[in-house]
């Protein structure tokens, strides 16, 4: 990316996708009407995604020293004007300042949650006020079409009063295990 062409940079690590098939009717009730629910082979997905964020910076700053945090988001998959993306129901993190900035400047539904991640070789345990998840990861694998539908998303959508807001999210393709 050219300097100045981005608003915020972050490093994401220890990221997991836990995916669930969800009914269209249940999702339609809680996703803003301007967003079209996106499906893969007729199935609608909701994902829980815990991860660690670090090295947050803005175009005019180095990485902020206090920018390491744990996060857990609950998301679904949508399109807006033909562009596929993510809609977040909630984004929990253990960093009050980051939550304030994300809520007030990016209109994202962040809330505070006490969170911890413990890692022991290939075993991970993620605890928050709202969830407790344990994982054991294996070898990396080749992505199938459903994996690509879920992980190869480069836009997020949120709503501020009457307006749909779109943010581009640039990242390398995720390596899955």
Enumerate the language-model features and the residues they cover.
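Hydrophobic, proline/glycine-rich low-complexity stretches
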Residues: 1-59
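Short, charged/polar low-complexity linear motifs in solvent-exposed/disordered segments
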Residues: 47, 54-56, 65, 103-107, ...
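A glycine-rich, hydrophobic loop/mini-helix early in the fold
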Residues: 40-44, 53-92, 96
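Internal, well-folded beta-alpha domain core
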Residues: 73-177
């Amino acid at each position: 990316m050219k300097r100045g062409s981005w608003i915020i940079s972050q490093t994401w690590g220890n990221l997991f996708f836990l995916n669930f098939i969800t009914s269209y009717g249940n999702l339609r009730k809680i996703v803003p009407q301007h967003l079209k629910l996106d499906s893969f082979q007729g199935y609608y997905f909701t994902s829980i995604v815990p991860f660690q964020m670090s090295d947050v910076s803005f175009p005019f700053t180095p990485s902020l020293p206090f920018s390491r945090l744990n996060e857990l988001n609950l998301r679904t998959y949508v399109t807006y004007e033909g562009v596929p993306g993510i809609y977040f129901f909630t984004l929990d993190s253990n960093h009050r300042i980051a939550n304030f900035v994300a809520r007030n400047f990016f209109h994202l539904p962040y809330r505070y949650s006490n969170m911890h991640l413990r890692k022991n070789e290939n075993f991970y345990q993620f605890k928050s006020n709202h969830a407790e998840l344990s994982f054991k990861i294996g070898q990396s694998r080749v992505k199938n079409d459903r994996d690509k539908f879920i992980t190869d998303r480069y836009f997020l959508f949120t709503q501020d009063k009457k307006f749909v807001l779109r943010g581009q999210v640039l990242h390398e393709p995720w390596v899955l295990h």
